Amino acid sequence: MKRKVLALVIPALLAAGAAHAAEIYNKDGNKLDLYGKVDGLHYFSDDSSKDGDQTYMRVGFKGETQINDQLTGYGQWEYNVQANTTEGEGANSWTRLAFAGLKFGDYGSFDYGRNYGVLYDVEGWTDMLPEFGGDSYTYADNYMTGRANGVATYRNTDFFGLVDGLNFALQYQGKNESQSADDVNIGTNNRNNGDDIRYDNGDGFGISTTYDIGMGFSAGAAYTTSDRTNEQVNAGGTIAGGDKADAWTAGLKYDANNIYLATMYSETRNMTPYGKTDKGYDGGVANKTQNFEVTAQYQFDFGLRPAVSFLMSKGKDLTYNNVNGDDKDLVKYADVGATYYFNKNFSTYVDYKINLLDDDDPFYKDAGISTDDIVALGMVYQF
């Protein structure tokens, strides 16, 4: 009986992160769910900046209120707290999600706040590894590739109720700028990122669509285009030029019969950051990247879920040592991992990231890109 329950519950948990939330209020059309997890996590690596304790806690809520038969208000908030620093170091925490919106029956939903960019509608299919993954080209606060500030999102499920499985989304992102290099307050000045202009963005627009073909197969695609800030366009050096930052992606997945397979391909232009730009490193923004991810997983009825994956991002026409037109792998690794679910609330996992970047290439040391392997061990309590 336990095996049958796990076989049903675990895929549902993986498909929707907060689907197993604890309902704390449900009355008179008002509903509030609380969800979260504590991950006791440790990395083993020759890279001293990665090696060691990585424990964190994540908590959030999802709420909705029934306004009338066709109109529902909703909101979500999610917060991350790192637990691998001393109490004297101060807060090491941040808001992951915070948005509110309205759902108009079959006519879709509209929300605004900090939310996932539409490119992640496809990227999320391969971002299913026990610990690593989802990092060939998607980063938080990098345009609409991951979690992002100031996004207004319209979503429609089943194409106005007319086509089962056909979903689409439209998204607009407002400008987000850090303080300029000469400490002059310009633009929005709402990025507290150490003046790293790589994570700024101008106004942008995105669209995504996914289709549940049936028999476990789904296909999806997304596209975004954004203005770049004046600081980004004029930075020079290893920072790509160009007035626009563009990205597109397409993906496929199969999720049935305890088997999960997913793959995606994407390209970006004037968008993707690599390496570090502080402490004398020569990281930058790639003029173009070509990105690929694939994962294969199997869910055993007794709770074990092994996974094998491969991810890569190739930077094109990079500027390195004052030479233009260099091509380099920015991300390239194989990943072997496994998760064991004791029940719907507790699991343990191991994840081995096998770094395939060439540690003899001076580019990676100069840019501050790690070429070391990482083994992650974790225990998770979730609710």
UniProtKB/Swiss-Prot annotation:
Signal sequence, start to end: 1-21
Molecular function GO labels: porin activity
Gene3D superfamilies found in the cross-reference section: Porin
Entry keyword Signal: yes
Membrane topology annotation: Multi-pass membrane protein
GO terms of biological process kind: monoatomic ion transmembrane transport
InterPro entries, alphabetized: Gram-neg_bact_OMP (IPR050298), Gram_neg_porin_domain (IPR033900), Porin_dom_sf (IPR023614), Porin_gammaproteobac (IPR001897), Porin_Gram-ve (IPR001702)
Gene Ontology terms: cellular component: cell outer membrane; pore complex
Localization in the cell: Cell outer membrane
Swiss-Prot/TrEMBL keywords: Cell outer membrane, Ion transport, Membrane, Porin, Signal, Transmembrane, Transmembrane beta strand, Transport
A Pfam family hit: Porin_1
PANTHER family associated with the record: OUTER MEMBRANE PORIN N-RELATED, PROTEIN YDDL-RELATED
Subunit organization: Homotrimer.
NCBIfam families cross-referenced by the UniProt entry: PRK10554.1 (NF007841)
The protein's role, per its UniProt record: Forms pores that allow passive diffusion of small molecules across the outer membrane.
The family this protein is said to belong to: Belongs to the Gram-negative porin family.
Protein name per the record: Outer membrane protein S2
UniProt organism field: Salmonella typhi
Gene giving rise to this polypeptide: ompS2
